[in-house]
Amino acid sequence: MKQETLLKVSGLKMHFDAGKGKTVKAVDGISFHIKEGETFGLVGESGCGKSTTGRVLLRLYEPTEGGVQYRGKHIHKLTEAESFRYNRKIQMIFQDPYASLNPRLTVRDILLEPMEIHGLYGGRKGRLEKVDELLESVGLNRAFANRYPHEFSGGQRQRIGIARALALEPEFIVADEPISALDVSVQAQVVNLLKKLQKEKGLTFLFIAHDLSMVKHISDRIGVMYLGHMVEITASSRLYQEPLHPYTQALLSAIPIPDPDIEDKRKRIILKGELPSPINPPSGCVFRTRCPAAMSICTAKKPVLKEAEEGHYVACHLYDGEVKKEYDEMEVTLQTR
């Protein structure tokens, strides 16, 4: 059965005023879509704009340019009634399970709050029953409802955060690095829980992360961001087997392999230089200052995200034959003068 597009991002830009006439280009013209029932992984190093993208989808930011459509409707042009319904259908799981829960409220009150705001489940009795159901769905004892956040471990707190996100029966969840603050032993448990809940409830996820090793196990498709730009999008399995963009190749080469024989023989790609500032990004390709395959065309022309292979999109001149040929011919002409 063909999956319908649930959310579509087109030419999204999110710029911030940095004072003194300077602008931070946190997100600078990205486009992608998320199909209903899938998990779309969004990866990249800190500062690449992935969390900002998630906040735009939640309508916490008004985009500088471009738009986001949810079920065909522009989310920043909704009526008040439509906005209220949208806010229920899209929820967030936060990165920090310690800071995202109100320490003054019991778990019961934390879960009840969004239900009461939206007037769900027919009154107090129905909501209390829903609290018990939510706790059990995330693997916690219903007796935990009387406790406060400080009484739980990091993994348990994140499960409470997941339960809170599920309280309004959403369709789409933005998971903003939900496992990065957890112990490695707990990360897999949380990922498996999210996969289980997705299967049971038909959820759609935007899974934001900087660690590609864990994204592999939950994502159907993955988008790779660098300095506010989308540089590659493809199916998860293909990205790990055949990465095309030099930045993606470098990220994947840094993931350790358990087999020492393979680990000793494989080539690790070390990127040169530092991450440029989003206030003053490089001309042309923003990755060119660190790219091991940079060409002169990369300074002059910004690459566009194009389909290099079926279902595999990349923004790199290495895969744009026409542009590369045209520029190479121009260089030869200049050299012969």
Task: List each model region and its residues.
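Conserved ABC transporter NBD signature motif
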Residues: G66-H74
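Conserved ABC ATPase signature
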Residues: Y148-F152, Q156
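A short, proline-enriched helix->beta-strand linker immediately N-terminal to the Walker B motif
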Residues: A167-E171
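Short catalytic/signature loops enriched in Gly
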Residues: Q3-T5, T23, A235-R337
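P-loop NTP-binding/switch modules centered on Walker-like glycine-rich loops
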Residues: P178-L182, V186-D264
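ABC ATPase NBD coupling module
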Residues: K20, I75-Q91, I117, R238-P243, ...
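Conserved ABC ATPase "signature" region
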Residues: H74, E116-G119, K125-A143, L252-S253
